[in-house]
Amino acid sequence: ESALAQHQTGRNSGVVHAGLYYPPGSLKARMAVAGAQSMYAYARAKGIAYDNCGKLVVACDESELPGLDRLAERAEANGVPARLLDPAAAREIEPYVRCVRALHVETTGIIDYPAVCRALADDIGAQGGEIRLGVGVASAESTPHGVEVHTTTGETLRADALVACAGLYADRVALACGLEPDARIVPFRGEYFELAPEKNYLVRNLIYPVPDPRFPFLGVHLTRMVHGGIHAGPNAVLALRREGYTWRDVDVAELRESLAWPGLWALAKRNIVPGAREVVRSLSKRQFAASLSRLVPGIEAADLRPAAAGVRAQALRRDGSMVEDFLVQTQGRQVHVLNAPSPAATAALEIADHLADSVEQVLAS
């Protein structure tokens, strides 16, 4: 990479997640709940822009009430402060929202994640570390005394241990380092729009739908960005390359690699209808706007301006099941992060502590 935060860190909703959605006891649940607080504390210490503004998850009709109730129960199980609201109470928080009931999640917020990344880079430099931009990993191997990493620039780097957090290339790096992960990264693009400034008054903070239980993403939502403006999205469509930020970004070899993984076909078979809906929404701004207007009436296609898309690095097993939790695998003195989609940005400092513990364990073994 030529710079920091070029992919998932710099191309997301900028949301600090409260830990609402994840199974109790999972790494995602525990690390998001703790991570939100540690991320806010880090931002305060470093002078990074953030706002613990809260969010609404809204049930737009009666059919979504059971799903909203399940989220409220999960919030309680995970220790997330949240309360159910009737429509009048919801409109005190978001005056233009349309709902039959809403869940107000107090510890959700927004933050400048690229600024967090730059601050962490400064911390690394202050402690004598070095970030080697423009250098790729060709392979790595364990040795009697640690690990040797061979780079694309012809260097061999030696260390006591290796921690690999390769995002969209996590599985490739693991394979190049001699591991055999039982899941593969399949890239899903999330497309965003920015609301026209004259319509920003429609959204105060964050408005989310009740997730469709048939599809493993949260649905398009409305998010106030920490430096201003309202972003809408993301949807979720298969990217045609790992860094496929538009439909024009195609890499035949990478696409063939995705299509060759049996898990993708199994996932597609189970999600034909919602998957097709996502593709239509990707190709039609009118359909995208229609999804948003369920949450906030008055948003039209003409109000949406294209914004930078992101690609989610999602690990997918051979049977088509998505790896739902964070996944870390160790081998010898290597520690590989094989699945870290949302809420990994929120949980970044907690994940770092977890990885530091893993390194201590492999060095002691």
Predicted regions and their residues:
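A short coil-to-beta-strand element that immediately follows conserved catalytic motifs
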Residues: 50-53, 131, 182-188, 299-308
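Glycine-rich FAD pyrophosphate-binding loop
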Residues: 1-11
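Helical element adjacent to the flavin cofactor pocket in flavoenzyme catalytic cores
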Residues: 103-161, 165-172, 347-360
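Flavin-dependent oxidoreductases
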Residues: 140-251
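Short beta-strand to alpha-helix junction loop
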Residues: 23-34, 58-67, 103-123, 132, ...
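C-terminal catalytic lobe of FAD-dependent flavoproteins
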Residues: 217, 247-253, 258-365
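Dinucleotide-binding Rossmann-like beta1-alpha1 core, especially the glycine-rich loop
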Residues: 15-89, 99, 219-221, 229-231, ...
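A short, glycine/Asx- and small/polar-enriched loop/turn
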Residues: 63-67, 93-100, 141-148, 157, ...
